[in-house]
Amino acid sequence: MKPFMDKDFLLSTETAKTLYHDYAAQVPIIDYHCHINPEEIAKDRSFDTITQVWLGGDHYKWRQMRSNGIDEKYITGDASDIEKFEKWAETLQKAIGNPLYHWSHLELQRYFDYYGTLSAKTSEEVFKLCNEKLSQPEMSVRGLIKESNVDTICTTDDPIDSLEWHKAIAKDSTFDVKVLPAWRPDKAMNLEKPDYLDYLAKLESVSGVKIASFAGLMEALKVRLEFFNSMGCKVSDHALSYVMYKPATEEEIEAIFAKRLAGGTISEMEELQFKTAFMVSVGREYNRLGWVMQLHYGTKRDNNVFRFNQLGADTGFDCINTEGSSAELANFLNALNSSDELPKTIIYSLNPTDNAAIGTVLGCFQDSTAVGKIQQGSAWWFNDNKTGMIDQMTSLANLGLLANFVGMLTDSRSFLSYTRHEYFRRILCELIGNWVENGEYPNDIEFLGQMVQDISYYNTKRYFGF
């Protein structure tokens, strides 16, 4: 029997062990998509308890605690930190096969030097140990980032954000990790939302552009795009239920937007037409600026309306959406490509059955402007586990060039989540190691080592231009 999560965790062959320890583990981390708060980096926040770090905003953990019958008081409510931690420990012990079990113990090992197991029996001991560690100066936010060997972080930011904390970090010569903004304009696109006009007023204010038309909206966004670009932004991100393509004329789009400005009701088709025009318009801007466009889709959000009204968005009540088709995705990309304005694009679907469809779409739009110009994103959210990662990378290898893959990101709100890069790298090396030891690929360790370093780090650095 193998020891629990030892140095060769997830590595079953000698090739995998060599590739991980000698190559993948040696390169830094670029976390090009996450949801951490740049203010906490700028102020170098310290945490009082492990509960604050682990359970303060992690809806992955909250979902499992609810599945274990834990009262909301101990999840998002007013229970004490030790009570919440004990309830999480009770839950984690049952999470066999869940990536949270591995992630949590990787974090305990790497940041707290704890190589035991977290359970109901050990929860008090682990709580005290972690809190003692967190009281040390090197366990501040910046210390954790440096300890994790991170060299670049891209946060997630709205077009109206001031980016004041990014400015402060960039001016601080004592911290050499790049913390760059990433453009997330969902609120400017989602005209069906009840607070849409309020948002437009804020966008008008920060851009200095009157938004009385769709053309005006695009001009206001262009002003903000230029500002983000001046702050080092190189990537956009879009959260979509699915990638739609319902084209309309300029006159029709202006009429839809005018109706919404006047407080009118927008039909479902009008919403899709507007969003299509929006995505094509901003896609052209990304190409002009040399940015990467990320498309995250396949999500049905806020399904539990009762809890949404209590707790708000991003609290653990989302699921996979099966709407949409690869045809509309291809048509959207083709609309940009037809005018030679298709930017580098990373495509993520929350629905794992989309893997092969995405893999075939990629091959339709590759060209010589970039290696792997159109990418399939790493297994995301509900697929961010051992099975999901293996399935995504195997599908990508079957249909494209795995060696050109831009690899992993945390998509996290926690400063301890950089161990997810380690998790990914171990799984990557195990996958490739098995192929080699099964005689399916030559045992050229020099080339293989460079490949896993490329997927872990260098492909990303080149692709984004960091």
Curated annotation (Swiss-Prot):
Gene3D superfamilies: Metal-dependent hydrolases (3.20.20.140), uronate isomerase, domain 2, chain A (1.10.2020.10)
GO BP, one annotated term: D-glucuronate catabolic process
EC number: 5.3.1.12
InterPro entries for this protein: Metal_Hydrolase (IPR032466), Uronate_isomerase (IPR003766)
GO molecular function ontology, one term from the record: glucuronate isomerase activity
Reactions catalysed: D-glucuronate = D-fructuronate; aldehydo-D-galacturonate = keto-D-tagaturonate
Coiled-coil region list: none
Keywords: Isomerase
Pfam family, one: UxaC
Pathway: Carbohydrate metabolism; pentose and glucuronate interconversion
Keyword Mitochondrion: no
Family under the similarity heading: Belongs to the metallo-dependent hydrolases superfamily. Uronate isomerase family.
PANTHER family in the cross-refs: URONATE ISOMERASE (PTHR30068:SF4)
Name of protein: Uronate isomerase
Organism: Lachnoclostridium phytofermentans (strain ATCC 700394 / DSM 18823 / ISDg)
Taxonomic placement: Bacteria, Bacillati, Bacillota, Clostridia, Lachnospirales
Name of the gene: uxaC
